[in-house]
Every structure is written in C-alpha cells, then in structure tokens.
Amino acid sequence: YVGEGLVASEQPVKQVILTSASSKTAYGAAHLLMKHKNERKLDYQVIGLTSANNKSFTQDLNCYDQVLSYDEIAELGEDKVNWILDFAGNKSLLLNLQNQFVNNIDKLILIGSTDVDAQQDKPHGHLESEFFFAPSQVKKRSGEWGHVGFSERYAKAWHSFAIHMNDKISVAEYSGAKAVEALYHTGLKNKLNNLEINVLKF
C-alpha cells in the first residue's frame, strides 16, 4: 500500500516519517520501506520519531535512516516532500508536523494509537489525513492476488523482517491469566521491555 503509493506519487517523496518509531509495527514497516526503497531505486529517507528514552534503542534496530526524538523535529527538512505514517495517535504532534511542513506533506496516514495518554488530549485543528485499516487491505490484496499469493507475499515480508531482527530482540512467553494480567499492568506503567516480543498463552 505505502510502497506502491510512493512509487506512484506525482511529487518525488524525500522523507517518510514514522511516529512511535520504537513500536514493533512501526519498525516492521520501516524495515520494509528500507528494503523496498533499495529494490525500487527510490530516493527517500526513512525517519523515525520516538521519545528521548527510546531513541538509542530505536537507532540500534537499524530499521531507519535517521531517528529523532520528538523534541528534535525542527531538524527535519521543511522544504522536502513528506509522507507521515502515524502509529502514535498524538494529534498535537501531528498538528505540529502539519504546521511545520505546511504544503510539503503529500500524505498523512493514521495507522495506530500507541500513545495512550495522548488520547485524552483533544486539541483543536483539522488534520488532512486518511485512515489505514489493515483488514480492508488484507481483503483487497487477497482479492487481487488470491489467498495463496497473499500468503506467499506475507511470508516473504515476515521472513525478511525476522532475519533482520534475529539478533536484536528475543521472544518471552507468558502463560496463564495471572501472568498475562501482570504483563498488562506492566504495559500500563510503560515499563515493557522493548527487547522482547511477548507471546501470551492461556
């Protein structure tokens, strides 16, 4: 979806900016954007925005060309055509980016809402954006490629990401309601281990 859009864009996109860059969905997308950029010979930078606490971790993933903390967004080139992929759901942040880039945001795609605290904040201002709904894309692509074709492409993308992340993160398993509940409360306190992918079993 994003890769094809970047190829088809009337204006060459120079920056693809991902918010909540330390989240697994974001850096998975970033990995594929880097891979597709090289395969399609496109000329954009994949830039991750994250909290200052997560900046070093996110840089070490090697999924981005550049990683900035949220208080460093002024360093982004204002005169470059941008796509913004939002995984945070922080409207204030998006309004700031929209104001900073003025007419140089070619597309703003709302994908996730990892910033739970920001959901309580309802700032005034209109976002020129569109929603990405994964089930709709799965249905669309399955119709175009067939179930087997979709599964093959999905497996290929996942395999590439898994190999890249193999020495960077580990899998942690939690079994039973109490363990799952404890992990949930750890998440609410924003103390989850970024170096782990959690597998929950009941």
What are these model-predicted stretches?
Residues 1-202:
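Terminal helix/beta-alpha structural elements that buttress the NAD(P)+-binding lobe
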